[in-house]
Amino acid sequence: VMFDAEHFFDGYKSNPKYSIEVIKTAFDAGAQWIVLCDTNGGTLPFELNNIFDDVKKVIPLTNLGVHFHNDTDNATYNSIESVRLGVKQVQGTFNGLGERCGNSNLVNVAANLILKLGYNCKLKKKLNKITSISRLIDEILNRQSLRNLPFVGSAAFAHKGGLHISAVEKDPKSYEHIDPSSVGNERLLVVSNQSGKSNVVNKLKKFKINIKGKEKKISSFLELVKNQESLGYAY
């Protein structure tokens, strides 16, 4: 049995004693999971520690779950912090789908727990499929995938500036916090009005175009690309 304590966090702030009594009663009656819900999405990360200190007096952390909404843009952070504090279950959705501002984004929660905090989650062996799953869900729902989504967005590992691209080619860690392939994503080197020769050379190599002896033409080609971008073209 899973008991979702709707509005728990707001209820606790209004009446701590009553809120604790409610979840204790459910647990004592046989509920295996007590899920604390931030239904209005207004709870902030710094509030969690004191609340869990009270809750764990009556419910073991191994039987606690959380369910955060994203109305203050803290759902993912709150979920990660809850796990760090000992909670064993996180409810959420892929791509943060949900009512109003959405729910905790399980893509970001899983990637951060596994890659940043070293948790041995069941998703660990399949984390490199998370980008394709994220995009498939958007395709099924006929939604435009957000380019700037952390980890799985098409722009998450995109580089435009010539200096950036030159540095990334020498040491990816200079401008990438993880290896894109660890989440099934890929590096994107963009040719734009911010580009240097490194961008163009990389793009030509990608298409297996031989540039030997043609280095002088790269500058004029780069200028052409920049002029075209000012007219609305993208490369």
Predicted regions and their residues:
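Small-aliphatic-rich amphipathic alpha-helix that forms the alpha element of a beta-alpha
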Residues: 67-94
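Histidine/acidic-residue-rich catalytic or RNA/ligand-binding cores of hydrolases
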Residues: 48, 101-108
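Glycine-rich phosphate-binding active-site loops on the catalytic face of alpha/beta enzymes
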Residues: 36-38, 85-102
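Glycine-rich phosphate-binding loop at the start of an alpha helix
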Residues: 20, 73-76, 103
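Alpha/beta enzyme core
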Residues: 1-64, 80-87
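Acidic, glycine-rich active-site loops and adjacent beta-strand->loop/helix elements
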Residues: 7-11, 40, 70-73, 96-99, ...
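Short glycine/serine- and small hydrophobic-enriched flexible loop segments
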Residues: 81-84, 111-115
